[in-house]
Regions:
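Electropositive, gly/pro-rich neighborhoods at or near active sites that engage anionic ligands
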Residues: 1-100
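Glycine/threonine-rich flexible loop motifs
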Residues: 135-146
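Short, catalytically relevant binding-site loops at active-site mouths
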Residues: 135-137, 166-169
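Alpha-helix C-terminal capping/helix-to-coil transition sites in glycosyltransferase folds
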Residues: 123-124, 154, 192
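A short helix->loop->beta-strand "cap" motif at the edges of active sites that frequently abuts
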Residues: 155-159
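Active-site gating loop/helix substructures
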Residues: 75-134
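C-terminal functional extensions of proteins
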Residues: 174-195
Length: 195
């Protein structure tokens, strides 16, 4: 839920203390150590409301979010990477730790169903902005959810990719901006990015 947390915080019309609270990571040696309060909040809200889409709607009310934060899918998936040397790395957090060049990423299970409200938002968009964010562990995984990449490619909206200003260690070492765009197109299709 880290990407969702960051989107909620970015669009929230709340006190700076609330932003600091949502980004706070617990320290020490307890079971909470390393976990972010915001991720735990979203996980708890998901359990209370029954699904992540409703959890985001309710969290948006709590945080006075301006705009909408929509999940690509309600399903829990694992992100795997096929490296250029053919090895497979399972799990998002392990991918940058492999220190190998990524060939492709994929979701497991492969056929995660898209949330209809997300598909509707793509269909009705005037502009679609991808990024910034970790190319292989944040931007591209959303495009792999069944129907999302295709909906973006078919959209008449202008499609803009905003590249990170810094290299994502273990993911995009040595990448140029055009290599970022090529990776997106290789995963989602040639019409996924206009600019």
């Amino acid at each position: 839920p880290g990407d969702l947390r960051n989107c909620l915080v970015a669009l929230a019309d709340t006190e700076p203390l609330m932003e600091k609270l949502f980004q706070h990571r617990f320290e020490g040696s307890s079971e909470l150590s390393g976990h972010s309060f915001g991720n735990l909040f979203i996980a708890a809200m998901t359990q209370v409301t029954g699904d992540v889409e409703t959890a985001l709607k309710e969290s948006s009310k709590v945080l006075a979010v301006k705009g909408q934060v929509l999940p690509a899918s309600k399903e829990f998936v694992r992100l795997d990477a096929i490296m250029e040397d053919g090895t497979v790395v399972c799990g998002e957090s392990h991918i940058p730790e492999a220190h190998k060049r990524i060939h492709r990423v994929k979701l497991y299970p492969e056929h995660a169903e898209a949330v209809q409200s997300s598909l509707d938002a793509i269909r009705n968009a005037e502009a679609i902005v991808l990024g910034p964010g970790s190319l292989y562990t944040s931007v591209i995984p959303n495009l792999l959810v069944e129907g999302i990449g295709d909906a973006i490619c078919r959209s008449k909206a202008v499609k803009i990719y905003i590249c990170n200003v810094m290299t994502q260690p273990g993911e995009t070492d040595g990448y140029t901006a055009s290599m970022h765009v090529k990776a997106i197109m290789d995963h989602a299709g040639r019409n996924a990015v206009d600019y």
